Regions:
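Alpha/beta enzyme core
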Residues: 1-152
Length: 152
């Protein structure tokens, strides 16, 4: 899709055409990428702003987000890197923060492409602790086995 300001009109057209859900993937400005990936859980990041704009215009359309740090990571990894190694548990903590920012913005479905051990339980517990019991977590097994994952 396009910039957040244009997305409501695109979402309206999609909904009129019978599209029930849209998936948002950010194209993060290089200046916002860091080794700590802080932009991933910024409540005013690109996908959160876009989601709020879409939901305000078309509340009935579903919005799906990807939960992964690679778009925000200066090193390009899905995990935080310390001492040349991916640190799983610290990464999972940050993925929970990202999932909460996305759910708070109005995401209905979270696809977890990050592949960190223990992330699903941690994300589910984090979502439920903050009242997001109805936010779905998509298995990437379903996504990989479909035509939906075509661009990659």
């Amino acid at each position: 899709m396009t910039a957040p300001a244009a997305q409501p009109s695109v979402a309206r057209r999609l909904a009129r055409g019978g599209v029930a859900c849209v998936a948002l993937f950010p194209k993060v400005d290089a200046a916002l990428k860091t080794n700590g990936c802080e932009e991933a859980w910024n409540p005013d990041n690109l996908v959160c702003r876009a989601t709020r704009a879409i939901k305000a215009a078309v509340p009935e359309i579903g919005v799906m987000h990807d939960v992964a740090l690679d778009p925000y990571n200066a090193l390009g990894h899905d995990g935080l890197v310390k001492g040349g190694r991916i640190v799983n548990d610290e990464t999972v903590e940050k993925l929970v923060l990202q999932a909460l920012a996305q759910a708070n913005a109005g995401a209905d479905v979270l696809g977890t492409s990050d592949m960190m051990d223990g992330r699903i339980r941690a994300i589910r517990e984090g979502l439920e602790a903050k009242g997001h019991e109805d936010v779905l977590i998509l298995s990437y097994a379903a996504k990989y086995a479909s035509g939906f994952y075509g661009p990659f």
